[in-house]
Curated annotation (Swiss-Prot):
Keyword terms, alphabetized: ATP synthesis, CF(1), Hydrogen ion transport, Ion transport, Membrane, Thylakoid, Transport
Subunit architecture: F-type ATPases have 2 components, CF(1) - the catalytic core - and CF(0) - the membrane proton channel. CF(1) has five subunits: alpha(3), beta(3), gamma(1), delta(1), epsilon(1). CF(0) has three main subunits: a, b and c.
Its biological purpose: Produces ATP from ADP in the presence of a proton gradient across the membrane.
Top-level taxon of the source organism: Bacteria
Name this protein carries in UniProt: ATP synthase epsilon chain
Its membrane topology: Peripheral membrane protein
Provenance organism: Trichodesmium erythraeum (strain IMS101)
Record family assignment: Belongs to the ATPase epsilon chain family.
Pfam families given in the database record: ATP-synt_DE, ATP-synt_DE_N
SUPFAM superfamilies referenced in this protein's UniProt entry, alphabetically: Epsilon subunit of F1F0-ATP synthase N-terminal domain (SSF51344)
Amino acid sequence: MTLTVRVIAPDKTIWDKEAQEVILPSTTGQLGILGGHAPLLTALDTGVMRVRAENDWIAIALMGGFAEIEADEVSILVNGAERGDNIDTEKARLAYEEAEKRLQTSESSDNLQEKIKAKQTLKRARARLQAAGGMVN
């Protein structure tokens, strides 16, 4: 049984195709979706979404949002998203390393906003690098 999967960001549609399976980074953990799933509305965390379409897995970096799931349809509204095959792995790796350094620097600061922003930047950089295929813990 297939699903119609749509990933929509404010500036463009990232994905609008049929798929056999979807794995989403919800705020409570990974969520696997197959055809015939019970209706669900869930918040999404920054992370990597995986879509199995035509027996290939496609990775998409999501920057938080919401997913509405029906029996055969998954609609995903996100703050930002990028397909892994459109991400330059080396640039993503450099951005991740820079974000790690920024977080380490912010840890010695008393500025709470700076710490939060550094953690968010690292989380986004990690999602992009993972979606591009550059493994990160």
